[in-house]
């Protein structure tokens, strides 16, 4: 469906993609599982623009599956500076994103919303905006998803492979995040937990399951 930008893509402005996936309906005040995409859900191939090159990171599949079973929205929040830099366009992003979602469906897991920000200080034309509020580490994508899905951000979790993901989570009011291949750290009001092995993945799955139980109690 075309939007007010006049493109066939779900752009709310030239550098912001917001797409609702599937028809799952959620009651208000649920937490969400926020996920970075490149380097978290799929292998990061440096500005991925070819759907044929997309490979999932299997570590994330049980986390998404657990959130799906728990009735918790799964929301992808991804910076896409390759678009701002002119390496590829929104059509290539759409093709890659479609492939990621297709591979996830083949594994029996589902995403409920995708948000992407293409703004970057090194961009060209209207995308050359430094420190755009939607670009992580700013919290704009998480906050916008929170408004659209009526989420409880404080109870939500974020998983990503960069400190910018954790900073976005903290600024959005989340209490904890999991850093792929990272180190644990505690900041005022926010805990960064490492995600490097099966034991630490178990901690993430337990946290998601706890949110599901809290929602049913």
Swiss-Prot record:
Gene3D superfamilies: HAD superfamily/HAD-like (3.40.50.1000). Its main location: cytoplasm. It comes from the Bacteria. Its EC number is 3.1.3.82. Coiled coil: none annotated. It catalyses: D-glycero-beta-D-manno-heptose 1,7-bisphosphate + H2O = D-glycero-beta-D-manno-heptose 1-phosphate + phosphate. Transmembrane segments: none annotated. The record marks 78, 136 as: Stabilizes the phosphoryl group. It is found in: Cytoplasm. Keywords: Carbohydrate metabolism, Cytoplasm, Hydrolase, Magnesium, Metal-binding. Mg(2+) binds at residues 36, 38, 161-162. The active site is at 36 (nucleophile), 38 (proton donor). InterPro entries: HAD-like_sf (IPR036412), HAD-SF_hydro_IIIA (IPR006549), HAD_sf (IPR023214), Heptose_bisP_phosphatase (IPR004446), Histidinol-phos (IPR006543). It is an enzyme of class 3 (hydrolase). The record marks 135 as: Contributes to substrate recognition. Pathway: Nucleotide-sugar biosynthesis; ADP-L-glycero-beta-D-manno-heptose biosynthesis; ADP-L-glycero-beta-D-manno-heptose from D-glycero-beta-D-manno-heptose 7-phosphate: step 2/4. One of its GO terms (molecular function) is D-glycero-beta-D-manno-heptose 1,7-bisphosphate 7-phosphatase activity. CDD domains: HAD_HisB-N (cd07503). Its cofactor is Mg(2+). One of its GO terms (biological process) is ADP-L-glycero-beta-D-manno-heptose biosynthetic process. GO terms for cellular component: cytoplasm. Substrate binds at residues 36-38, 44-47, 78-81, 135-136, 162. Belongs to the gmhB family. Monomer. This is D-glycero-beta-D-manno-heptose-1,7-bisphosphate 7-phosphatase. It comes from Mesorhizobium japonicum (strain LMG 29417 / CECT 9101 / MAFF 303099). The gene is gmhB.
């Amino acid at each position: 469906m075309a939007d007010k930008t006049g493109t066939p893509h779900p752009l709310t402005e030239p550098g912001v993609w917001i797409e609702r996936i599937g028809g799952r309906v959620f009651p208000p005040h649920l937490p969400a599982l926020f996920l970075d995409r490149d380097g978290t859900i799929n292998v990061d191939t440096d500005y991925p623009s070819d759907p044929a090159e997309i490979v999932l990171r299997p570590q994330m599949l049980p986390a998404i599956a657990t959130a799906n079973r728990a009735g918790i929205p799964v929301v992808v929040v991804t910076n896409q500076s390759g678009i701002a830099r002119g390496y590829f366009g929104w059509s290539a992003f759409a093709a890659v994103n479609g492939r990621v979602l297709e591979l996830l469906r083949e594994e029996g897991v589902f995403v409920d919303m995708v948000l992407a920000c293409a703004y970057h200080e090194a961009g060209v034309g209207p995308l050359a905006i430094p420190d755009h509020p939607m670009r992580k580490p700013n919290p704009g994508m998480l906050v916008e998803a929170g408004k659209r899905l009526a989420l409880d951000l404080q109870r939500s979790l974020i998983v990503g492979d960069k400190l910018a993901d954790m900073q976005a989570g903290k600024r959005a009011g989340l209490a904890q995040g999991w850093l792929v291949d990272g180190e644990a750290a505690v900041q005022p009001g926010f805990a960064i937990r490492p995600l490097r092995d099966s034991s630490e993945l178990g901690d993430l799955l337990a946290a998601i399951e706890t949110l599901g139980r809290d929602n049913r109690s």
